[in-house]
Amino acid sequence: MTRYVLGRIGQAVVVLWAAYTLTFAILYLLPSDPMELQLAAAGVQPDSLSAGQVAAIKHQFGLDQPIWLQYWHHLSGLLRGDFGTSLTQQVPVSDLLAQRIGPTLLLSVSAALVSLVAGSALAYLATFTRWTVLTRLPAVGASFPQFFIALFLIQFFSFQLGWFPATGGLVLPVITISVLASSVLAQVLIKSFEETLSQPYVVTARAKGLSRSAVHVRHAFRNAALPAMTILGVIVGLTVTSSIVVETVFTREGVGKLAQEAVLSQDVPVVLAVVTVAAAIFVLVNLVVDLLYPLLDPRIAVSGAAR
């Protein structure tokens, strides 16, 4: 069990490091110059500065250093809890995150809860009723791009019915994210339900005279939900990453919109901070699920100990 736990923690650290390093490499492979974008954001033309002034600005932000040294400075600062200073806004990145993370957490948590409830309910109803429409509905929901769902909801519920605001609201963004996340969860649960209902202990329970609902609730649901736990991390990842698109479409002042603005201006410290926080949330949830799974299914712990 100890080896299993240490292995999962080691994998989590590697994933975080890989996400950070890959993001850093992509940002520095972009053809644009971060300093020029920073000056443009301040309304200054780079051609109006002397070579000495340009060199001083690059030195101030460490842009004149070799790329490996810039990488090390960013990484060592992150390990100390220092995300650095925004190149375009000249404020600590941690302050920007603190200002924007509240709306994003509210959106992500709300969407995750709605997705869990809706996905589980849809999977149970589809399995219990065996209605073809319900069985195929998750595949339909997972096939639509989120920006299309967002624009459809705005057009119908905001412009035509006038029930919800087109920008800055919470209900429509939550629905937009939940359609995809709940559809993915429902697909996994339906497959798990079908496999569980064919197990010998379920057949025996039916032979003893238990009703279909009793068999589903007492025997099938708990065992079918165990494999679906592994997808909880994916659901959380979907809700976090989806916030970038959703907050942009609905003009919500959250971390997602901050990330979009930072990418467009090539604000490296901000982008690295957002990616690191998002990856940390994703990795942490998956790590918790991995550590809880052996407690709920002792076979995992036994197989891990055997190896």
How should these model regions be labeled?
Residues 22-29, 76, 136-165:
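Membrane-water interface segments at the C-terminal ends of transmembrane alpha-helices
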Residues 16, 20, 24-32, 37, ...:
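Membrane-embedded alpha-helical segments of multi-pass transporters/permeases
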Residues 16-69, 162-170:
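Hydrophobic alpha-helical transmembrane segments of membrane transport/permease proteins
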Residues 2-23:
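Hydrophobic secretory-pathway targeting helix
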Residues 62-120:
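An internal, D/E-rich "acidic patch" concept
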Residues 2-3, 97-133, 146, 166-307:
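Alpha-helical transmembrane segments of integral membrane proteins
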Residues 48-80, 250-261:
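Short hydrophobic, aromatic-rich alpha-helical segments embedded in or entering the lipid bilayer
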Residues 54, 58-66, 82-86, 93, ...:
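Membrane-interfacial helix-loop-helix junctions in multi-pass membrane proteins
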